Design a protein with these regions (language model features):
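Extracytoplasmic metal-acquisition and chelation regions
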Residues: 1-185
Length: 185
């Protein structure tokens, strides 16, 4: 708690890449740095960067189209919430069991009740969990409301199966587009 007269610090979310728009900035900075460090390879880096940025533009357009055509703009997470940049980029509202990527492992009864009431009152069809989660909180909300439990992948951890299948950022974020489409309609 801040002392009277002190400003509360804003919630910090290090998951900047959950917004494809931010991912573009990251990719460009990496490319620029590689071009400086390896001038003979600069043409290849620039070509690969241009191709990847085009894919990120397409991903951004897909997210925008889903949100623009959505019946609602509210996401519910029975889990941590590493999607602040995604939510801000597309004007989405969210409610989560834990702030950001809190180290808390048990949500309060009041938080659980609030999320159940929110899902029920707004007829929200999906409750999200993040990758490598135990999904307990999302399952609890689902059992109380009938909402479906889906993964929204923050792209900072990857399962062994996804790794072996060669899945990368674009694949995981494309899966997120489809999960968001279901959640917002």
């Amino acid at each position: 708690e801040p002392a009277p007269g002190e400003a509360e610090e804003p919630e910090y979310d290090e998951h900047v890449w959950t917004s494809p728009r931010n991912a573009k900035l990251i990719v460009q900075k990496i490319s620029d740095t590689l071009c400086e460090a390896d001038a003979p390879g600069a043409d290849a880096y620039k070509a690969n960067t241009a191709a990847y940025l085009a894919q990120l533009d397409q991903l951004d357009a897909e997210f925008k189209a889903v949100v623009d055509g959505a019946a609602r703009r509210t996401m519910v997470f029975g889990d941590r919430f590493p999607f602040r940049y995604l939510a801000d980029a597309y004007g989405l509202d969210y409610f989560a069991a834990f702030p950001g990527c809190s180290t808390e492992t048990e949500a309060s009864a009041a938080t659980v009740k609030f999320l159940i009431d929110k899902v029920s009152a707004e007829h929200i069809p999906v409750v999200f969990h993040i990758e490598l989660s135990n999904e307990k909180m999302a399952d609890t909300i689902s059992e109380a409301t009938g909402a479906k439990v889906l993964l929204l992948h923050a792209c900072h951890n990857i399962s062994r199966d996804d790794f072996l299948a060669g899945k990368g950022y674009l694949d995981l974020m494309t899966d997120n587009v489809e999960a968001l489409r279901e959640a917002l309609n």
